[in-house]
């Protein structure tokens, strides 16, 4: 089991890549290690399915809880469905890999990354991305690599390479950059309202580090005796493409200049042109080369027609600076927005439409117990802001089975979630758990950025005090040789024909999220900088349109939203509030009809649809946790009587005992001779014994309510109590 280990010194750390030792039957395998984090990545190729017209690439990231020394909490004590984090890392591996395979590749390719050990100082995702390239190269699959990825953080004014989990949480930037020798091929980022210039500098900083990991992979290939060359482009029979260009260029070109057509009208006209060309080919002689090509592969006409349409659209953008809907390259489609369109049973709602893309977002306010428990390897706490994205088939005029959310839906939801997190109010002042759901009602490009805009509207409509509203735009790019055109607010057909999909979200102050995917093997940082800068006026324009609809949070919450009171108690007294077996807190919730959550730090949150009930529960808890001192005077009710004395509730939930000898200056034979259950009495704290029991006395205390010392704490509501 001997293998080859290569060590790369990287920003003060060592990255170890071991090849030739693990998974010997896989096409290629590498164990990548840094600190105590270890990820095994394999790449395997097998013959593709006959007639496939796409690249069947599968990337899977697998988490094993033993990697963090944990046993799964499921009934079977075995890992089940991949958690969201694993799905997102699978996408993170797929996105920079996919554009690096040749366009003719149709073989099945599977990349599997398994996290075997996790060090909290070294996140596993970027290691898995880099190792996926190395495994693919070792498998000798046709591939335009090497490719590598790094993470860039920002602590204060300093960029940090591959920060720890804790540094990511503390910092203002979480940026993943993947690149090849040709340039940057993928970006994924969350930022705390950073300027465009800061983000551009971070991308440049990250790409410099990427080049070092690329050199390490090239060195390993050389030591392994693998002579890696860029894949050769397969020769394509140009008979049919040439025929379509000759007979279809004019009608397609004329159609693409009819800017007044709707998407549906244009699609129907294109289908009509394709049908006419097909009929023309059918009329050719049987021995005609074009007809033979179609007969051997019926899908060839559709594929070649799409390629010609794509080619002509790109030419029109490069030469004329005009898009299929007549917009200028930097022009945003028509914006419409509405807030509060659903009944207030829904706590907040927003409708956002840009061109034919329409998204309905809803916001729901929940209690701390509604937080999402994260059963994965991420050491971060439970999620208190959740965004779910749904993409039904009717949104693109199609029919298909409705199943559980796929990777794309999970990824788009995570991007919209990331865009809003920097502007959410702090938990101390607004302790609600928030869930936003974005329903894509119609899709024609950039539904994820539509979800960002719709989410902002819905949250403001729900009364959530956002630090600033967030908008987003998707940027595209056409690259023909040295000619480059950047497109603002791309629609679906431009996503199909273009070379880049670059989503930028942020506030008026700065960027909160980025996501860039490529169809080419890399872009210079300068081109990426141009796209980021061109996105700013688009974001600002969209934000202005949104602000015309709603520019600040509603002053009152929905009457159907829970009301919360939040206050802090001594953490050492949490057990007192909970009581043996939870009896005390259960009694409070039943008595007041409230829901109570207590965090380890002593923060108590009370949820109720009745503000008065919440205040009553707060009084009881503060009474239980309030320290009582000798000599204090309280007025309370007799709760029970025993032969040697009577118990008085001096504070909500807190009792003291009056010994029979302390009921009167005179001798008392029976407790009932002086007091009975329900009597209101004024007592003084005589002593607190070493077991914390409160001993009271009536002796020398005037039975006058003016003498009472009963604190009335002022509630600290974090949301209006209506």
Swiss-Prot record:
Matching SUPFAM superfamilies: Eukaryotic type KH-domain (KH-domain type I), Nucleic acid-binding proteins, Ribonuclease PH domain 2-like, Ribosomal protein S5 domain 2-like
Enzymatic class: transferase
GO function terms (MF aspect): 3'-5'-RNA exonuclease activity; magnesium ion binding; polyribonucleotide nucleotidyltransferase activity; RNA binding
InterPro entries the UniProt entry points to: ExoRNase_PH_dom1, ExoRNase_PH_dom2, ExoRNase_PH_dom2_sf, KH_dom, KH_dom_type_1, KH_dom_type_1_sf, NA-bd_OB-fold, PNPase
Span list, region Disordered: 701-722
Gene3D superfamilies in alphabetical order: GHMP Kinase, N-terminal domain, K Homology domain, type 1, Nucleic acid-binding proteins
Cofactor: Mg(2+)
SMART domains recorded: KH (SM00322), S1 (SM00316)
Domain S1 motif: 631-699
Amino acid composition bias (Pro residues), ranges on this chain: 712-722
GO process terms (BP): mRNA catabolic process; RNA processing
Catalytic activity field: RNA(n+1) + phosphate = RNA(n) + a ribonucleoside 5'-diphosphate
Compartments, as annotated in UniProt: Cytoplasm
A single cellular component GO annotation: cytosol
Name of one Pfam family that matches: KH_1
Record's keyword annotation contains Transferase: yes
Record-listed Mg(2+) binding positions: 495, 501
UniProt key word Hydrolase: no
Positions with biased composition (Polar residues): 701-711
Keyword annotations from UniProtKB, A to Z: Cytoplasm, Magnesium, Metal-binding, Nucleotidyltransferase, RNA-binding, Transferase
Sequence ranges assigned to domain KH in this UniProt record: 562-621
Function text: Involved in mRNA degradation. Catalyzes the phosphorolysis of single-stranded polyribonucleotides processively in the 3'- to 5'-direction.
Family affiliation: Belongs to the polyribonucleotide nucleotidyltransferase family.
Annotated protein name in UniProt: Polyribonucleotide nucleotidyltransferase
Source organism of this protein record: Prochlorococcus marinus (strain MIT 9211)
